[in-house]
């Protein structure tokens, strides 16, 4: 059983990065449901090994656990099992009502459609990237991590992070400009 100090440390240092953990899992697994499962598993692992965390970057430590959990999950799946494209950009009436009730103005329907179409194009271009490039791009551009943090998570030298990021950006550009629309 964990001590109260371990629990408090976990809540203070690890839980604030829950969204980043889910986002990484979502991009690597291409499925919201699978990302939720893997994120929960990764959080359990992080909690179990919290006393082993002696670093100063809890986000990088957690994202490395999430990344490893994602790859373990992928390896455990049958090769023929397809990963879904996910639900990004879908209309969610409950979410729309909650935003309206909270006093947030909603964009016009045509603006929402254009934004959703743009979102789908970017997502489709990202989905076509090899996972090694996609993870680097997501960690840098979505999670806004620096090269050193990404290198620690992915367990490669900083130079490799830089070259993969450059290549990922170029491939994303090609996918976006020349990919299936």
Go through each PLM region and give its residues.
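Arg/Lys-rich amphipathic alpha helix in sigma70-family domain 2
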Residues: 67-86, 101, 115
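DNA-recognition helix of helix-turn-helix
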Residues: 142, 148, 154-178
């Amino acid at each position: 059983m964990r001590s109260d100090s371990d629990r408090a440390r976990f809540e203070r240092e690890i839980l604030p990065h829950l969204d980043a953990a889910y986002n990484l899992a979502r991009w690597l697994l291409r499925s919201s449901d699978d990302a939720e499962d893997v994120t929960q598993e990764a959080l359990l692992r992080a909690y179990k090994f919290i006393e082993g965390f002696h670093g100063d970057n809890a986000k990088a430590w957690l994202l490395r656990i999430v990344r490893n959990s994602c790859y373990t999950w992928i390896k455990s799946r049958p090769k023929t099992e397809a990963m879904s494209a996910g639900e990004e950009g879908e209309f969610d009436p409950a979410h729309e009502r909650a935003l309206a009730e909270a006093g947030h103005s909603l964009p016009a329907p045509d603006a929402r459609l254009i934004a959703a179409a743009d979102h789908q194009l970017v997502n489709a271009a990202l989905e076509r990237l090899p996972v090694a490039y996609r993870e680097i791009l997501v960690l840098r551009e979505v999670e806004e991590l620096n090269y050193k943090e990404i290198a620690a998570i992915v367990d490669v030298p900083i130079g490799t992070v830089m070259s993969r990021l450059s290549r990922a950006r170029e491939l994303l550009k090609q996918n976006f400009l020349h990919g299936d629309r």
